[in-house]
Amino acid sequence: MSKLSFITSNQDKYREVKSFFNEHSLELGWTRVSLPELQADTLEEVVEHSLSQFNGEDVFVEDAGVFIDALGGFPGVYSRYVYDTVGNAGILKLMEGVENRRARFEAVIGFKPAGGGDVKLFKGEVRGNVSLSPKGEGGFGYDPIFIPEGFIKTFGEDESVKSMVSHRKRAAEKLLQYLKRNL
């Protein structure tokens, strides 16, 4: 396998995935490219579209979202836009008075081998609840309002929990298993 490169403009995502790769003594390159945010119905569509723009080296991209049950899965694939527009405060405003606070983070990683070939998709998910207020300064995005199932603190309060159970880590683990078996 040639050098594997993560294509993202998001330094926080890169840092999170690189940490996981470091745990497995694997080198991970970073191609810092700002990809246009495709408005699609699924994370998989966004990832496949992003990968269609790259050839020549082993690359992967990742897209993620938070899907809130009481809001019909919103913001879902529009998570970045919604976060940039209204932030956590806007989500919490929408959730005022809502008892069902169930939510899930989903991440989809798409891998494209050097020289083309079929794109392989790997999905990770973590279930939990939306907190009543933002808690913690750690992480990024929706981390301060997401409490993973089985824990009492948000990802923003305890980044060590996120590093153990995050949706992104679960997708990256599947990518790593694939790479070990196939390349």
Segments (PLM) and residue ranges:
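Anionic-ligand binding patches
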Residues: 2-5, 12-183
